[in-house]
Swiss-Prot record:
Protein name: Notewaprin-a
Predominant cellular place of this UniProt entry's protein: secreted
Subcellular location: Secreted
A GO CC term assigned to this protein in UniProt: extracellular space
Range of residues in the leader sequence: 1-24
Disulfide bonds: 34-60, 43-64, 47-59, 53-68
Entry GO MF terms: serine-type endopeptidase inhibitor activity
One Pfam family hit: WAP
Keywords: Antibiotic, Antimicrobial, Disulfide bond, Secreted, Signal
Tissue spec. comment: Expressed by the venom gland.
Function per UniProt: Damages membranes of susceptible bacteria. Has no hemolytic activity. Not toxic to mice. Does not inhibit the proteinases elastase and cathepsin G.
GO biological process, one term: innate immune response
Amino acid sequence: MSSGGLLLLLGLLTLWAELTPVSSLDRPKKPGLCPPRPQKPPCVRECKNDWRCPGEQKCCRYGCIYECRDPIFVK
């Protein structure tokens, strides 16, 4: 395969990997709120949405950090 073809394939794979699956768009968000920001290195992306996290965990965003965290509930 030519280098141009490989570059196109790589670009398409990258775009495909970044797109959110349509099936997650119609799902409601999980209950609860994200806890305070953890102390971690910058720009870690562990998840893209709640449904990529196990159990009741939520996909929480702290700046450029995305990670699965146990929710907190405020009364």
